[in-house]
Amino acid sequence: QAMGMILSSRRVGADEGYRMGFVTEVAGVEGLDALVARFAADVLKASPVSIRTSKALVVTGLAQPDMAAAMLAQHGDPAFAAWMASEDAREGPRAFAEKRSPQWKGY
């Protein structure tokens, strides 16, 4: 389906994009603020280091020619090394094991 859309420049609406799997969630005008607030709240629950790292690694991976190269490049990315060395990288599994909410430090 993606190739057909690319070659024909066919546009799709939000509902069709959702059915195809590249739109995460759809809301009408009346529900948009609640959807955005819910999404933001979910993002804010995560470690700031993890969010920064995830964004950087997606960009790194997308610049690669294939999945194997993307995985290799991501593991060599300075953002990945910084995350692995962070206190937050240890706090997440520790909080999970202790059945408590993590206390992110942001480093």
Please place each PLM-identified region on the residue numbering:
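Short helix- or helix-capping micro-motifs
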Residues: 1-10
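Helix-loop "lid/cap" segments that line or gate small-molecule binding pockets
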Residues: 5-6, 57, 61, 78-84
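Short, glycine/polar-rich helix-capping loops at beta-to-alpha or helix-loop-helix junctions
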Residues: 10-16
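C-terminal long alpha-helix characteristic of the crotonase
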Residues: 14, 23-74, 104-107
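Terminal peptide-recognition signature
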Residues: 17, 54, 96
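Structural motif
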Residues: 20-21, 99
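Interdomain hinge/lid region at the active-site interface
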Residues: 85-89, 95
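Terminal low-complexity tails and localization/encapsulation signals of metabolic enzymes
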Residues: 94-107
